[in-house]
Curated annotation (Swiss-Prot):
Keywords: Activator, DNA-binding, Isopeptide bond, Nucleus, Transcription, Transcription regulation, Ubl conjugation. The lineage of its organism: Eukaryota, Metazoa, Chordata, Craniata, Vertebrata. SUPFAM superfamilies: Leucine zipper domain. Binds DNA as a dimer and can form stable heterodimers with CEBPA and CEBPB. Interacts with ZNF638; this interaction increases transcriptional activation. Residues 56-72 have a biased composition (Basic and acidic residues). Residues 62-125 form the bZIP domain. Residues 97-118 are annotated as: Leucine-zipper. GO terms for biological process: B cell differentiation; DNA-templated transcription; enucleate erythrocyte differentiation; immune response; integrated stress response signaling; liver development; mRNA metabolic process; natural killer cell mediated cytotoxicity. Residues 28-37 have a biased composition (Low complexity). It is found in: Nucleus. One of its GO terms (cellular component) is chromatin. Residues 27-94 are annotated as: Disordered. This is CCAAT/enhancer-binding protein gamma. Residues 66-93 are annotated as: Basic motif.
Amino acid sequence: MSKISQQNSTPGVNGISVIHTQAHASGLQQVPQLVPAGPGGGGKAVAPSKQSKKSSPMDRNSDEYRQRRERNNMAVKKSRLKSKQKAQDTLQRVNQLKEENERLEAKIKLLTKELSVLKDLFLEHAHNLADNVQSISTENTTADGDNAGQ
C-alpha cells in the first residue's frame, strides 16, 4: 500500500502557497502548486511571473509607447504582406493547375480518338481473318469431299 502524507508550506506573497511536499512510499516529491491562502479563498491565485507585472495604462506620449506602436505597425505590415504574397502564390498555383488540366484533357481526347481508330482497325482485321479462316475451312471440306470420291 502506498502511504501519502502532505505538508503545506506557509503562504507566500499574496497569500499563495507555492510548494507542497508529498511523501510517498517511494520518497519525497516536491510539487509546485498555486493554492489560495486562507480557508475562505478570498483572493485569486496568481502565478509568480504575473505578480510583479502591474497593468498601468501607458502614457501615449512616452518613447516606450511610440516604440511599441512602431514595432506593432511593422509587424502588422509584415503580416499583411505575407498574407498577400501567400494569396498571390495560391492564385498562381491555381492557374498553373488549370493549364495543366486543360493540356491533360486535350491529351485524353487525342488518346481516345487514337484508341477508337486502333480498335476499329483491329476489329476489321479480326473480321477479315475470320472470313479467311472460314473460306479456307470451306475449301478444305470441299476438297476432302472431292478426294474421298477418287
